[in-house]
């Protein structure tokens, strides 16, 4: 742990701040380095010299800190978090994916800043639950905006700059501008060329950063990891190992193995026994993982946990291996029906809030979650979506798409899905995200609504490049209902909706999957009585919804992790 104390513990000067940074991949800049034009003014002869601290998931190269600081945030590549302190002002800048959260609070006249909730707890003046944020967490799996589960402790958002001032005031603003091109590409072939070029650049840079270390690709039965595996093969990546995990006999494991064999890549699987997973989760390994990964804002992302635990214990992979998950800029749209028919402003804002508050099965939960509604309105302001009643939506469907995707990227993706990277760090591994890098964002935002609002173009593109690489057709893992042809499926769903049986049938199918999941998710439900699980699921709760309840109750593991009062 790096414990960087910039003021004496008894110092009450207005410029005081304390950093408690625990990640081993921080780089600390030389005092007195010349700040870029956008930084605060240079320190006076009597004030402390400027301090700079850069986090990356892989150890940065020589000069990386200075070169990154000189770039504008929107031009920086890779995953990063930057701290700049100069003349009493502390600036915390996060990347688009919020790849490394920072937490901050005020203790007397001193700012306390950390990347570890346990460390912050030791230095914060109080450790009390934020009940309003906890209510959102129950329904969403994350806390919105800058709020955390601890009162008066705050967290950095994605793509933002937080400024902490010596007088105790602070502000947060987005540096990212999420806008689709005014004159977008409409040709699928032209868009494919742009997309290929972006992938080439991002993957080649990641391979240089990895510098010969073993590469691990979590290979599911879906599109994203398959596309990444194809691109690694195209670029001649060495020492690539693919893997998957699941209960023995699951179709996703079989498909994953087939993809690896077709690409000529090494592959292994970790078998999951729900009983053993539940037993291990209830012990010290489970609570330790929760503490290392929740970041005071997010439900711990447990999907990879047991597989990673076995890899580390059994030395299945190199100790300094680098994971390349298939997380991508593609597919952040939801409620696609709003792109047609001219929805009202309120319909769009409601759709965004409702989409992120369904974990307990309550479609009206958003109504009593003012923090979530406020985060949606903030996102609307950041993409210039009208927040005042009346008037048409500028840009039609594209305006709607920008808002729904941006709120998703800022909230659920940044705080829950992307928090899954902390699982790799918890076991001492590195990671990188070539399909979420700067070039990929730029490329995707050049595409037309027809090419980007759904995953249809992307699925076709992936099938084509997979065929080029292997000479075989794609086989994807999909839920049983998805195997029905599109036309009959739409007719079936319409009929079920009219008769009132769609919701009941959907819940019955999802309950069966949740209680016997191909990735043994039911193991994490074990602390909740089985009858209560059934009752909650019948009301529409998801597995994740059960976990948020257990986590907040302090019963998900051997001991509570969150503030309990």
Where are these regions (language model features)?
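Cysteine-centered catalytic environments shared across enzyme families
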Residues: 1-219, 223-275, 542
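Generic recognition of stable, solvent-exposed alpha-helical segments in well-folded globular domains
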Residues: 157, 190, 194-198, 223, ...
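Short, glycine-/Ser/Thr-/acidic-enriched flexible segments
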Residues: 97, 118, 328-330, 441
């Amino acid at each position: 742990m790096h414990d960087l104390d910039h003021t004496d513990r008894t110092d009450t000067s207005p410029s005081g701040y304390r950093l408690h940074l625990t990640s081993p991949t921080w780089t600390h800049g030389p005092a007195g380095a010349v700040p870029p034009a956008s930084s605060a003014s240079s320190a006076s002869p009597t004030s402390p010299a400027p301090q700079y601290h850069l986090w990356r998931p892989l150890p940065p190269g020589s000069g990386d800190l200075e070169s990154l600081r000189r770039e504008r945030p929107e031009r920086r590549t890779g995953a990063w978090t930057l701290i700049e302190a100069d003349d009493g002002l502390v600036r915390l800048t996060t990347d688009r994916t919020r790849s490394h959260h920072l937490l901050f609070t005020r203790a007397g006249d001193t700012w306390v800043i950390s990347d570890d909730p346990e460390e912050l707890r030791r230095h914060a003046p109080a450790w009390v639950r934020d009940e309003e944020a906890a209510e959102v967490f129950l329904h969403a799996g994350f806390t919105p905006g800058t709020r955390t589960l601890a009162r008066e402790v705050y967290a950095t958002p994605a793509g933002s700059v937080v400024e902490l001032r010596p007088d105790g005031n602070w502000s947060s603003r987005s540096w990212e501008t999420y806008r689709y091109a005014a004159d977008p590409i409409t040709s699928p072939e032209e868009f494919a060329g742009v997309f290929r070029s972006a992938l080439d650049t991002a993957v080649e840079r990641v391979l240089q950063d990895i510098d010969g270390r073993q590469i691990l690709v979590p290979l599911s039965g879906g599109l994203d990891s398959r596309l990444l595996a194809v691109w690694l093969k195209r670029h001649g990546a060495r020492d690539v190992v693919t893997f998957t995990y699941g209960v023995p006999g699951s179709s996703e494991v079989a498909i994953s193995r087939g993809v690896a064999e077709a690409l000529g890549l090494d592959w292994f699987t970790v078998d999951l026994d729900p009983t053993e997973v539940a037993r291990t989760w209830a012990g010290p390994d489970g609570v330790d993982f929760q503490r290392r990964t929740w970041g005071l804002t997010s439900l711990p992302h447990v999907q990879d946990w047991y597989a990673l635990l076995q890899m580390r214990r059994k030395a299945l992979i190199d100790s300094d291996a680098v994971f390349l998950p298939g997380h991508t800029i593609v597919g952040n749209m939801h409620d696609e029906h709003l792109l047609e028919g001219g929805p009202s402003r309120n319909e769009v804002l409601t759709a965004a809030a409702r989409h992120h508050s369904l974990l307990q099965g309550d479609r009206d939960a958003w109504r009593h979650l003012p923090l979530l509604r406020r985060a949606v309105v903030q996102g609307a302001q950041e993409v210039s979506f009208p927040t005042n009643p009346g008037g048409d939506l500028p840009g039609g469907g594209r305006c709607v798409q920008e808002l729904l995707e941006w709120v998703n990227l800022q909230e659920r993706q940044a705080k829950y899905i992307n928090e899954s990277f902390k699982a790799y760090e918890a076991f001492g591994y590195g990671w990188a995200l070539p399909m979420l890098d700067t070039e990929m964002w730029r490329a995707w935002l050049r595409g037309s609504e027809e090419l980007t609002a759904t995953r249809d173009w992307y699925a076709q593109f992936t099938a084509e490049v997979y065929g080029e690489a292997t000479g075989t057709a794609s086989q994807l893992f999909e839920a049983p209902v998805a195997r029905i042809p599109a036309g009959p499926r739409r007719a079936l769903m319409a009929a079920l909706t009219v008769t009132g049986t769609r919701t009941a049938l959907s819940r019955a199918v999802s309950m069966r999957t949740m209680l016997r999941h191909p990735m043994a998710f039911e193991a994490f439900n074990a602390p909740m009585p089985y009858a209560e699980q059934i009752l909650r699921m019948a009301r529409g709760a998801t597995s994740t919804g059960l976990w948020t309840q257990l986590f907040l109750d302090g019963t998900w593991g051997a001991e509570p992790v969150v503030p309990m009062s």
